[in-house]
């Protein structure tokens, strides 16, 4: 499973969701020639979820591109070291994500997710504990 789908899912962000996003783009943030991918500007014009890999060094440019498209209040999440014990997550909007990155000291390796689906995030903290509790409640009702 690609990290572009698995890492957002691991913190409860779906890449598509009815009434939020019908599709998604997966884009490399930095090309072989160390420039920002031109596809980011195209993706910023769409309503799709945008997943950017290797984009932290271009975050300021990404923010500018989305802001230029009138999307400064669009939700964005950055997941550093996704699915690992040292995972860090920053969630905000295009307009404030750079200050969140600074505050949380986010850096590479990280995945950037942009779009309404970030607001659909399901809190998966303690999911196993909650599942166990639900199973216990079911057993009590059955008894």
Residue positions per predicted region:
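Short glycine-cluster motifs
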Residues: 1-30
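A contiguous loop/helix-start segment that scaffolds small-molecule binding in enzyme catalytic cores
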Residues: 21-23, 32-143
């Amino acid at each position: 499973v690609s990290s572009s789908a698995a890492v957002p899912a691991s913190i409860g962000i779906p890449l598509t969701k009815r009434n939020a996003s019908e599709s998604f783009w997966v884009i490399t943030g930095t090309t072989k020639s160390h420039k920002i991918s031109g596809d980011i500007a195209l993706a910023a014009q769409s309503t799709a979820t945008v997943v950017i890999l290797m984009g932290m060094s271009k975050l300021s440019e990404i923010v500018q591109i989305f802001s230029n498209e009138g999307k400064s209040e669009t939700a964005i999440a950055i997941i550093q070291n996704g699915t690992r014990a040292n995972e860090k997550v920053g969630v905000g909007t295009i307009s404030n994500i750079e200050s969140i990155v600074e505050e949380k000291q986010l850096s590479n390796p990280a995945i950037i997710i942009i779009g309404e689906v970030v607001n659909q995030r399901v809190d998966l903290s303690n999911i196993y504990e909650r599942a166990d509790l639900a199973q216990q409640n079911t057993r009590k009702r059955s008894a």
